[in-house]
Design a protein with these regions (language model features):
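Short, small/polar residue-rich loop motifs at catalytic or cofactor-binding pockets
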Residues: 24-27, 148-149
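Zn2+-dependent cytidine deaminase-like catalytic core
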Residues: 32-130
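Alpha-helical scaffold segments in soluble metabolic enzymes
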Residues: 10-14, 55, 59, 114, ...
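Short, basic/aromatic recognition patches
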Residues: 3-23, 141
Length: 176
């Protein structure tokens, strides 16, 4: 495992802190590193709150010359919060390591382009599969226009959900 793996894995751990809290936003984690030391970390707050990058910048205080590791391309549009990409640029980061591109049409590569246009070195694709898996609902909604749906069905061995009389019987256990 190299040093970049370590920081991106931490980003993925942080992103999971947003599980079931951040929709319709994606779960994002961000770690800021300078001179081999973590200077700030963050994850996306519930909708309307700060994004991961803003949380990490706030924790760092001074991010000049730092490398930003982030699980999803920083947003480049203003919604309930300002664009994260501009906050990273204004903070003076020197490098961004991004797991995956944001499929949201309002971003879709624009965040990466803005970073590169200001001279910030950008590397993409580190742990991309894991980052996409973490946000499969968000990604499917933007790439295919459909939600990610999860269904649980319990049936008896003969494919029934109740007896012929309509009376329901336990066919699963609490652990299921």
């Amino acid at each position: 495992m190299n040093i970049h793996d370590k920081y991106m894995q931490r980003c993925l751990e942080l992103a999971q802190e947003g599980w079931a809290k951040v929709a319709p936003n994606p779960m994002v984690g961000c770690v800021l590193v300078r001179d081999g030391h973590v200077i700030g970390e963050g994850f996306t707050a519930p909708a309307g709150g700060n994004h991961a990058e803003i949380e990490a910048l706030s924790a760092a205080g001074d991010a000049l010359g730092a490398t930003a590791y982030v699980t999803l391309e920083p947003c480049s549009h203003a919604g309930k919060t300002g664009p994260c990409v501009q906050a990273l640029i204004d903070a003076g980061i020197s490098r961004a390591v991004i797991a995956c591109e944001d499929p949201n049409p309002e971003v879709a590569g624009e965040g990466i382009k803005l970073l590169q246009d200001t001279g910030i070195e950008v590397a993409c694709g580190l742990y991309e599969d894991q980052a996409r898996e973490l946000n499969k609902g968000f990604i499917k909604r933007h790439e295919q226009g459909m939600p990610w749906v999860l269904v649980k069905m319990a049936a008896s061995l003969d494919g029934r959900t109740a007896m012929a009389s309509g009376q329901s019987q336990w066919i699963t256990t609490p652990a299921a």
